[in-house]
């Protein structure tokens, strides 16, 4: 509710340590088999959710492992490292030159053997292509989740609202808009959970009469990112011809690697 997602045509993306995509629906459904939807704060709704467990944690991982020089350069320019990297990737074409990343640095509950994968390296790729591929991989996986949830619910989402620390980046929000082919809205703060908690408190004290009333007074759209249709077509080709097949093709390999990593041979 902190991002005003109380209508079934809207979904909330959290670009946090764990990256999630959450819907708000009247009719209960499981976003994945045996994975229940959360009860929503409004009593008559549910919040089915799809998550990438190591979501924007991967940004911190990349910076720690590959961006020591970039941190020095960013400090000299007087900008934070994330803004510095945004500037480095904003002109890289959609698809990162054919570099595709499956963002399972830690597996989810439903696929405990899953692992991260990067495919498509060529000699022209740089660490900045990898950085962009991380963001694209997270967005493609969340898009995959939305496709599955829309199919299971017969609900169509046509607006996205972004929160979490990663939403502070306009480059991240534009990539998300281009992947999903939907407008991505930001509100006045990326700390949308805090806004939602405050709403509940104000409603309980009678300051606002309903969630709609609280949203009207407390949630203010800051800006919106409109999809670049050419980029969206590129991402849909990547999703349809490559990304959507990765998990099933890699499953037997991941099973062995999990066995290997836990002491087997």
Residue ranges with predicted function:
Residues 1-10:
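Conserved phosphate-binding catalytic cores of ATP/NTP-utilizing and phosphoryl-transfer enzymes
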Residues 10-12, 21:
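Acyl-thioester C-C bond-transforming condensing/cleaving domain
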Residues 23-265:
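Glycine/Thr-rich phosphate-binding loops that ligate phosphate moieties of nucleotide
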């Amino acid at each position: 509710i902190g991002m005003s997602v109380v209508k079934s045509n809207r979904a909330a993306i959290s670009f946090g340590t764990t990256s999630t995509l959450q819907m708000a629906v009247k009719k209960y459904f499981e976003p994945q088999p045996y994975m229940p939807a959360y009860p929503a704060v409004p009593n008559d709704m549910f919040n089915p959710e799809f998550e990438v467990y190591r979501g924007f944690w991967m940004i911190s991982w990349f910076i720690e492992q590959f961006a020591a020089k970039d941190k020095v350069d960013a400090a000299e320019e007087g900008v934070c490292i994330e803004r510095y990297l945004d500037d480095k990737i904003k002109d890289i074409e959609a698809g990162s030159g054919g570099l595709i990343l499956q963002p399972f640095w830690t597996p989810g509950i439903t696929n405990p053997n899953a692992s991260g994968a990067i495919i498509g390296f060529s000699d022209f790729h740089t660490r900045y292509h990898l950085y962009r591929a991380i963001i694209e991989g997270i967005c493609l996986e969340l898009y995959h989740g939305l496709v599955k949830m829309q199919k299971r619910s017969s609900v169509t989402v046509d607006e996205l609202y972004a929160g979490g620390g990663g939403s502070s980046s306009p480059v991240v929000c534009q990539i998300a808009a281009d992947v999903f082919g939907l407008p991505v809205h930001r509100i006045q703060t990326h700390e949308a959970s805090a806004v939602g908690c405050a709403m509940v408190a104000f409603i309980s004290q009678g300051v606002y009469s309903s969630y709609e009333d609280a949203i009207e007074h407390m949630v203010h759209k800051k800006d919106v990112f409109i999809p670049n249709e050419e980029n969206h077509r590129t991402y849909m080709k990547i999703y349809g011809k490559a990304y959507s097949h990765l998990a099933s093709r890699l499953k037997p390999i991941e099973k062995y690697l999990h066995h290997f990593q836990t002491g087997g041979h």
